[in-house]
Each structure stands twice: as C-alpha cells, then as structure tokens.
A protein has these predicted regions:
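Short, basic, alpha-helical segments at the C-terminal edge of helix-turn-helix-like DNA-binding modules
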Residues: 57-61
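Hydrophobic alpha-helical connector segments
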Residues: 63-108, 124-127, 131-134
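A contiguous pocket-lining binding segment that forms or flanks enzyme active sites
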Residues: 112-165
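Actinobacteria-biased recognition of intrinsically disordered, low-complexity terminal regions
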Residues: 1-6, 210-212
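Helix-turn-helix
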Residues: 7, 11-49, 53
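C-terminal peripheral helix-coil segments that are non-catalytic and often amphipathic
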Residues: 119, 147-212
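Amphipathic alpha-helical interaction segments
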Residues: 7, 49, 77, 108, ...
Length: 212
C-alpha cells in the first residue's frame, strides 16, 4: 500500500496509543510504515505538523454537541464522548489545547462548542468560562483516569479486596474501610465519578446563562 498523509497520521496515532507520544519519531514511524524516514517529509514537514494532524484525528472522534436538544444534554454528550476518546488516546490529553496551528476538525469542534453555549443564552465571556470549566473537568478526569491502576469496576473491587484493604487496619482507618466497602458493594467504577462531577458542573452553570 502506498503512502499518503492519512496513512502516515493514522499510523502515528496507532503508535502513540500503544507506545506513547514521547518516543514517537519520524524514524520510528517510517519503520512501522516500511518506508524511509525522509519519505515522510513529503507528507508532514516535521513532528509538530504531525502532532497537529494527529490531534485533528482525535478531535474528529469526539461527538459535536447535537443541535436538536437542550444545551445541558448537548454538552453532556460531548463531554462524555471526549472522555471516552481520551481514554482511547491518553497521549493526547496534554496536547488537545496546545496546538498553535489547529486543523479543521479542531476548529470545527471549538466552533460547535462555543455556538452551543452562545445559542443557549450564555453571554460571550460566560460561554468562555463555561467551556473552560467543562474542559477542565474532562481533561483533569482523563488525566486522573489514565493513571489509575485499574480500568473497570470489577478490577477496582479486586484491587480493594486484595491490595488496599490489607493495608488499612479497620481500627486505624475506619472511614477508608467504610468507603471501600460501600464502593465495592455499589459496583462503583471510574465513569460514575466523571458523570457525578459533570452533572454538578452543568447544573451550576445553568443559572449563569442569562447573566450579564
């Protein structure tokens, strides 16, 4: 299969998903594509341009706020989608807002989010505040989730039983034992914590829609 910019960028995303972005080099990427390193510069001028294109692919995967529903539902769906996408591409968490040459999907995404908030009645500056606040929750949670030593509620339950509780004598840490038992009994997992925080943020923003 011949090279194209799309193939180069998709392969770069695949490598970053498996190996992280720090070790991604044009030489490593060329090897994965079975091509010479210099041939890649026909499609991307340098690593920064490659990262711009990779981030654009990530933004393409995030659902835009739908226009056929209320602003809270629309921003909720978009935030949940963003968290799911960043769980697939954790290397992108620190890069999403760092690009000085954003691609078309990146720009479309930010335009759609801003439009959703403005059409809902948020004044210009308040729409910016709302956008930053929601994104801070999404990116902060994604970063925290990427560092957790478990992925699912079942894995958390096993870790609590086998790893955490043996380190927590009940007479010394009664409240941590209480919390751990409640979480395991509830089948609690990382996504529930994100939804809890997201719904609080959206509810808190609602009264600010008509503020000057």
């Amino acid at each position: 299969m011949g090279l194209s910019k799309q193939r180069v960028v998709v392969e770069a995303v695949r490598l970053a998903d498996h190996e992280g972005v720090d070790g991604l080099s044009m030489r490593r990427l060329a090897g994965a594509l079975g091509a010479g390193a210099m041939s890649l510069y026909h499609y991307v001028a340098n690593k920064e341009e490659l990262l711009d294109a990779m981030i654009d692919i990530v933004f393409e995967e995030i659902e835009l706020p739908p226009e056929d529903t209320d602003w809270q539902s629309a921003m909720r769906r978009r935030a949940i989608s963003a968290r799911e996408v960043l769980a697939r591409h954790p290397w992108a968490i620190g890069l999403l807002e760092s690009r000085t040459s954003p691609g078309p999907a990146n720009l479309r995404h930010h335009e759609a989010v801003t439009a959703c908030l403005r059409k809902a009645g948020f004044p210009v500056l308040m729409a910016t505040h709302a956008n930053w606040l929601i994104d801070s929750l999404v990116y902060g949670y994604a970063l925290q989730e990427a560092s957790l030593p478990f992925d699912t509620a079942d894995e958390l339950a096993d870790m609590v039983e086998d790893v955490f509780l043996p380190q927590l004598p009940s007479d010394e840490f009664p409240y941590l034992n209480e919390s751990a038992a409640a979480l395991v009994a509830a089948g609690y997992g990382p996504p529930e914590e994100f939804i809890f925080g997201l719904d609080l943020v959206l509810a808190a923003l609602e009264p600010l829609r008509a503020s000057a």
